[in-house]
Amino acid sequence: MKHGAERFEFYLKKLDDLFTQAGSQSDPAAWLYQNGARTPLFMLEGLARLYSNLQDKKSFEKVEQKAKSLEDALGVIDYYDGFAKQFATDKTLPDGVLTFTQKRVAESTATLNELLKDKEWLGADSKQMRKIRKRLDEVDWLDDKKEVKAIEHYYSDEIKSIDKFAAKYESGFTELESQVHELRRKLRWLSIFPQALQGVVQLTDTPSNDPVLAKYLTPEITGSPFNKMPPAGTNEYTLVLNRDNFYALSWMIAQLGILKDQGLRSDLLGESGHESDADKAAEADVLKQSSAITNTYFKEQSLDHLVNGLRHY
């Protein structure tokens, strides 16, 4: 089996186990959410997203769509459940906000249960998993060198695309979801692919000693397990990223995530009919802070120097 196929099968096996167990639960959606199904789905989606830009676009897009449909549904549950847990201990909120949010948790869980049943995801003989494997069995996988070169080209193209996206908002963000959150999504994929690829991507071994990057190298970032690359293993070729530039990317993703969550809290209060003038002001401040760190980051051109090159073992 080619390395590319092995990477997909790694996550498919995890999902096989989850869907088999979920099939015997009274509330499969809640069980999948509570047992971490979102992570392997996200990794599978990421692999399919990447490979659809490397080869056989149609097959990989189908796999991406299937994984994304479930990952998105779990994401909605996570969104409401996360805030429901926050709101449960916040005595300053207006009456009705917690009840509204808990109701949304129940509704989003019911929606996922319908999807799981209608599309036949559950059980040891999952129809959707069979369809995914059938698609992947038809792929003419690239050899290692061609594959890693294609990944390198994809990173370069994607970085140029992200630069253009960010440049549109040099004068400042005006919208949370389509601007701040979308930028974070684009950046985040660049940090997700290395984990999903299981050793294909490695970081340089030595620090850059670049004073411009020093502010991004916080203990939380440099010590994060998500910033440790899986071992290269049997991969003959790897794509090497500059370590400190990767840390800077990780810092940006983390900070935009913190700001995004602050803005989403205001959005949810508005959805429940309880957004105050102070909440609106807080969202405006989120946009302002997001604009400031984004402009600084892209003016420094750290992302443009993320890719170091190929390594042959």
List PLM regions with ranges.
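Function-determining surface determinants
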Residues: 1-313
